[in-house]
């Protein structure tokens, strides 16, 4: 029996339509991607709210001069980075900064108190530039994503930001605008979702 051309045409048309439908993303897929992207951006913004706060930024200077206070004024006594990020021999950071806050003098303290390496200078950078420097192994101490998460969520010096002690006048130092637990979650989620830096 000879098959009429019209039937062949209809059969091919139906098959083509089915193939197209099978390979067309569903609306729900778009919604899921958009939701995931928005969630990642929220985590990024929350993380950056902390990294650009004085508690972090004061120890990530671009001029090798540690900063102090909410106004980020230069460290008293003419302190500077020194060759190993710990000041100079006669004025080493741990001369005053011990492993914990001094509630009598108001001098802050945490384990291995020091300036961040010069390669991690964030002062004056945009959020995007900070993120790029954070992820670049040439500037982040050759840390992998896993090591960065550990550093940012477990290192006592980083977490000091939420237990900064008091000023010499007895006033409490300002805390970052995000809670410690929310910051940790934001960091973990951002890296888990690929550490994507928003384009704007």
Label every PLM stretch briefly:
Residues 64-84, 99-108:
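Inter-heme linker and motif-flanking segments adjacent to c-type heme-binding CXXCH motifs
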Residues 54, 91, 101, 106-200:
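C-type cytochrome heme-c attachment and multiheme electron-transfer modules
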Residues 42-45, 49, 63, 70-71, ...:
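Acidic-enriched, low-complexity/disordered segments with a strong bias for Aspartate over Glutamate
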Residues 34-37, 71-74, 165:
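A generic structural signal for ordered alpha-helices
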Residues 1-42, 52-58, 62-67, 185-200:
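Post-cleavage N-terminal segment of exported redox proteins
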Residues 19, 24, 68-69, 74-77, ...:
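Generic alpha-helical propensity signal that fires on short helical segments
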Residues 42-52, 72-92, 120, 176:
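Flexible gly/pro/ser-rich segments immediately N-terminal to CXXCH heme-c attachment motifs
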Residues 54-63, 90-100:
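The canonical Cys-X-X-Cys-His
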């Amino acid at each position: 029996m000879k098959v009429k051309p019209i039937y062949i045409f209809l059969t091919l048309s139906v098959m083509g339509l089915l193939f197209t439908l099978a390979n067309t993303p569903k609306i729900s897929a778009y919604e899921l991607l958009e939701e995931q992207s928005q969630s990642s951006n929220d985590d990024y913004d929350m993380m950056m709210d902390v990294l650009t706060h004085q508690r972090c930024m004061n120890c990530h200077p671009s001029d090798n001069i540690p900063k102090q206070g909410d106004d980020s004024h230069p460290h008293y006594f003419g302190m500077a980075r020194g060759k190993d990020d710990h000041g100079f021999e006669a004025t080493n950071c741990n001369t005053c900064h011990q492993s914990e806050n001094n509630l009598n003098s108001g001098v802050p303290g945490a384990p291995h108190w020091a300036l961040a390496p010069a390669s991690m200078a964030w002062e004056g950078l945009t959020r995007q530039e900070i993120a790029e420097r954070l992820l670049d192994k040439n500037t982040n101490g050759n840390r992998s994503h896993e090591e960065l998460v550990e550093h940012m969520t477990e290192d006592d010096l980083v977490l000091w930001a939420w237990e900064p002690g008091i000023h010499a006048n007895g006033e409490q130092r300002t805390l970052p605008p995000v809670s410690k637990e929310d910051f940790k979650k934001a960091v973990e989620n951002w890296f888990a979702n690929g550490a994507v830096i928003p384009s704007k």
